[in-house]
Structure formats: structure tokens, C-alpha cells
């Protein structure tokens, strides 16, 4: 069990108390991104007219006086992204702190209960080992993956939102994001992606901030995180340059200074794949890009909706990129931008709201 350290200076630092609407927005945004994105997952090309037509189908029939979302209530299923995100949240709420043994057990039991949520084969092997009575170290199965190199996929990042919704101290956010990811992703390119995603949600939760300041803070954190020996060794072993996440954040900064960026450039530089390095920066770029209007997306969609639409339009690992961007945007804009017709079309949306309220209570207790 890993509790937050008293030495982190929590008592000496006055921390803001974000409103519960941001917590509900974060988990709702993540759920929307997963459920909506899953419909288009794996497509190399997602045509925007097809996506917009699908979204119009979520609206209730006009003129019938039905409540929003009633036409397609809970018809969109969530995937392993949300299943594992829920495990993170449920563990934090049950234990009132990060507990690696409890969280690992919940991951494995959730897979055993519902194995058809779209889990990758590699992580299934980890779950099977975690379910074994002989497993004495819950981090060992992940360390053994890929001949001891560990996974650098985006699975740690996609589920991490519960960490910054529990811990207000940025050092705790980094520490427990890393530990939660290491239960399945032992390569630094995997867990550093989870840290980056957690930091993005943490910053978004604090409220209004410029795109420049948001990126500068992320770059500052990641340059420090990626300078350790393991991060440098792992990146070089996989043929990447040093500080790969930091470099992509700087590329995002360049993109945001341009009047327009073709989708092809975004895919080439940032990606739309299952590696954390090829998806977490993409989610962050999507959030920041969609702070402003997009000429290709109808104006009646708000910032949160625009963010999710843009993510899905990139194709590839649509649900994971959209769930990460949705969590960031939801934390930033709050539940006010969560359209009822979208939310109520998603499986377990009411449970998600309840979990968000409980996380807000836990977060405030730790201030």
C-alpha cells in the first residue's frame, strides 16, 4: 500500500478546491470519448460526414417532447478503457488511497467477469498471472512482458483520470499515476504516458489557463521526468530520441502557432496508435486545438463535443484517444458542456456521475 507522503508539503500549501462539476465533467467526458470512439475504432479513415450523421442519430426524435437521450438510452457500450478506469476509481474510493494490491486484483477480476470488452492479448497475460495464487508481487507480471522490456502501450494512460481526481498535490499525481500504470505497463514509455495524461487532467481541473501556460507546465514536468536513466535507456532501446514526450509537446506548441494544421501532419508527428507516445500527445493536442472553433466542425457543438469529434476524426485508436482528451476537456469545461443526449446514450452514465461525486469528496478530504 502506498499512501501519500506527509513530506510532500500538503499542509503547508493552500490548494484550490475545484467544483464537483469538473469531476463529473471529467469522468463523463472520458465515458463519452470511449463509447462514441469505440464505434469507429480501428478505421484508418473516419469521414467527418459519417461521424456527424452518427452523432445526429443520438438526438431524440424532434417534436415528441421526449427528454434528451431517450431515443438511445445506454445503447453505446464502453470498452476496456472505461472498465479499467472504473477499477482505478473503485479502488481509490474503497481504500481511500492508492493500494496496488487492491487495484491489481480489481483489474484481473474485472477482466475475468467481462473478458469481451476489447482487451489486448498482452494485458490478458498479465491478468492471468495476477489471478494466480502464486503471485506475490503485483508488479512482476508487467515487468516480465515483452522479454522483460515491459509494455509501452497507452493502457496505463487511458484509465488514469481517477488519480488526479483523488490527489491534489502534483507530486502525488505523478507518483501514483506511475505506480498505477506499472501494474500493466513497465516500460517508461508506457508509464510516462500515464503520468503525462494525469498531469494534463490535473492542470485542467484547476480551471482557466492559457494554452501556452498549459503546455509550458507539462513540458517542464516531462523534461524532468524523462531525464532519468530508465526513461533515457528505454527510449534509446526502442529507437526513439531522448525526451520523446517532451519533444512532442514542443511540436504541439508549434502546431498551435499555425493557422491550420493538416490531419496528415498531426498523424505523422503525433500519431493515432496504441503506443502511449503515439496517442497521449495527440489527445492533449486535440484538447488544446479545440479550445478554438474548427472550420470543419459545425459551430453548434461546444468545446468538449468538438474535442471528441476531432479525436474520432483522426481514425486509429479512436476510443482511447477520445477518452483521454474527453477526460481533460471534461475536467476543464465541467459537466455544463456534457450533452445529455450523448451522455445518456452511454452505458453506466449514472454510475459514472455517482463515482465522480464520491471522488470530489475524497479529493476535498485530502486538501
Swiss-Prot record:
The keyword Protease does not apply. It is found in: Nucleus; Cytoplasm; Chromosome; Mitochondrion matrix. Its EC number is 3.5.1.-, 3.2.1.143, 3.2.2.-. The record marks 41 as: Glutamate flap. Keywords: Chromosome, Cytoplasm, DNA damage, DNA repair, Hydrolase, Magnesium, Metal-binding, Mitochondrion, Nucleus. It comes from the Eukaryota. Binds 2 magnesium ions per subunit. The keyword Cytoplasm applies. One of its GO terms (biological process) is negative regulation of necroptotic process. GO terms for molecular function: ADP-ribosylserine hydrolase activity; hydrolase activity, hydrolyzing O-glycosyl compounds; magnesium ion binding; O-acetyl-ADP-ribose deacetylase activity; poly(ADP-ribose) glycohydrolase activity. The protein undergoes a dramatic conformational switch from closed to open states upon substrate-binding, which enables specific substrate recognition for the 1''-O-linkage. The glutamate flap (Glu-41) blocks substrate entrance to Mg(2+) in the unliganded closed state. In presence of substrate, Glu-41 is ejected from the active site: this closed-to-open transition significantly widens the substrate-binding channel and precisely positions the scissile 1''-O-linkage for cleavage while securing tightly 2'- and 3'-hydroxyls of ADP-ribose. GO terms for cellular component: mitochondrial matrix; mitochondrion; nucleus; site of DNA damage. Mg(2+) 2 binds at residues 41, 317, 320. Substrate binds at residues 80, 149-155, 185, 238, 274. It is an enzyme of class 3 (hydrolase). Gene3D superfamilies: ADP-ribosylation/Crystallin J1 (1.10.4080.10). Mg(2+) 1 binds at residues 79-81. Pfam families: ADP_ribosyl_GH (PF03747). Its cofactor is Mg(2+). It catalyses: [(1''->2')-ADP-alpha-D-ribose](n) + H2O = [(1''->2')-ADP-alpha-D-ribose](n-1) + ADP-D-ribose; 1''-O-acetyl-ADP-alpha-D-ribose + H2O = ADP-D-ribose + acetate + H(+); O-(ADP-D-ribosyl)-L-seryl-[protein] + H2O = ADP-D-ribose + L-seryl-[protein]; alpha-NAD(+) + H2O = ADP-D-ribose + nicotinamide + H(+). Belongs to the ADP-ribosylglycohydrolase family. Monomer. ADP-ribosylhydrolase that preferentially hydrolyzes the scissile alpha-O-linkage attached to the anomeric C1'' position of ADP-ribose and acts on different substrates, such as proteins ADP-ribosylated on serine and threonine, free poly(ADP-ribose) and O-acetyl-ADP-D-ribose. Specifically acts as a serine mono-ADP-ribosylhydrolase by mediating the removal of mono-ADP-ribose attached to serine residues on proteins, thereby playing a key role in DNA damage response. Serine ADP-ribosylation of proteins constitutes the primary form of ADP-ribosylation of proteins in response to DNA damage. This is ADP-ribosylhydrolase ARH3. It comes from Gallus gallus.
Amino acid at each position: 500500500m502506498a499512501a501519500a507522503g506527509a513530506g510532500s508539503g500538503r499542509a503547508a500549501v493552500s490548494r484550490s478546491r475545484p467544483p464537483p462539476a469538473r469531476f463529473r465533467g471529467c469522468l463523463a467526458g472520458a465515458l463519452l470519448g470511449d463509447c462514441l470512439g469505440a464505434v469507429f475504432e480501428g478505421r484508418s479513415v473516419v469521414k467527418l460526414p459519417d461521424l456527424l450523421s452518427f452523432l445526429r442519430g443520438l438526438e431524440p426524435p424532434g417534436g415528441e417532447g421526449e427528454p434528451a437521450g431517450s431515443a438511445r438510452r445506454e445503447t453505446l457500450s464502453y470498452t476496456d478503457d472505461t472498465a479499467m478506469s472504473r477499477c482505478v476509481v473503485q479502488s481509490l474510493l474503497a481504500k481511500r488511497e492508492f493500494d496496488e494490491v487492491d487495484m491489481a486484483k480489481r483489474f484481473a477480476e474485472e477482466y475475468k467477469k467481462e473478458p469481451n470488452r476489447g482487451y489486448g492479448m498482452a494485458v490478458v497475460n498479465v491478468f492471468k498471472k495476477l489471478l494466480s495464487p502464486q503471485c506475490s508481487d503485483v508488479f512482476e507480471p508487467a515487468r516480465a512482458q515483452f522479454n522483460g522490456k515491459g509494455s509501452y502501450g497507452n493502457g496505463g494512460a487511458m484509465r488514469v483520470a481517477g488519480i488526479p481526481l483523488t490527489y491534489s498535490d502534483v507530486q502525488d499525481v505523478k507518483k501514483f499515476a506511475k505506480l498505477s500504470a506499472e501494474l500493466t505497463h513497465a516500460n517508461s514509455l508506457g508509464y510516462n504516458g500515464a503520468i503525462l495524461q494525469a498531469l494534463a487532467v490535473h492542470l485542467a481541473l484547476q480551471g482557466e489557463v492559457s494554452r501556452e501556460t498549459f503546455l509550458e507546465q507539462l513540458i517542464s514536468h516531462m523534461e524532468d521526468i524523462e531525464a532519468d536513466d530508465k526513461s533515457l535507456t528505454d527510449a534509446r532501446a526502442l529507437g526513439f530520441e531522448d525526451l520523446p514526450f517532451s519533444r512532442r509537446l514542443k511540436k504541439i506548441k508549434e502546431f498551435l502557432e499555425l493557422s491550420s494544421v493538416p490531419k496528415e501532419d498531426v498523424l505523422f508527428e503525433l500519431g493515432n496508435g496504441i503506443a502511449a507516445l503515439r496517442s497521449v500527445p495527440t489527445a492533449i493536442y486535440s484538447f488544446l486545438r479545440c479550445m478554438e472553433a474548427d472550420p470543419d466542425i459545425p459551430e453548434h457543438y461546444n468545446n468538449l463535443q468538438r474535442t471528441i469529434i476531432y479525436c474520432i476524426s483522426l481514425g486509429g485508436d479512436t476510443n482511447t484517444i477520445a477518452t483521454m482528451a474527453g477526460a481533460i476537456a471534461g475536467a476543464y469545461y465541467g459537466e455544463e458542456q456534457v450533452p445529455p443526449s450523448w451522455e445518456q446514450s452511454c452505458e453506466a452514465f449514472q454510475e459514472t456521475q455517482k463515482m465522480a461525486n464520491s471522488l470530489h469528496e475524497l479529493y476535498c478530504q485530502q486538501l
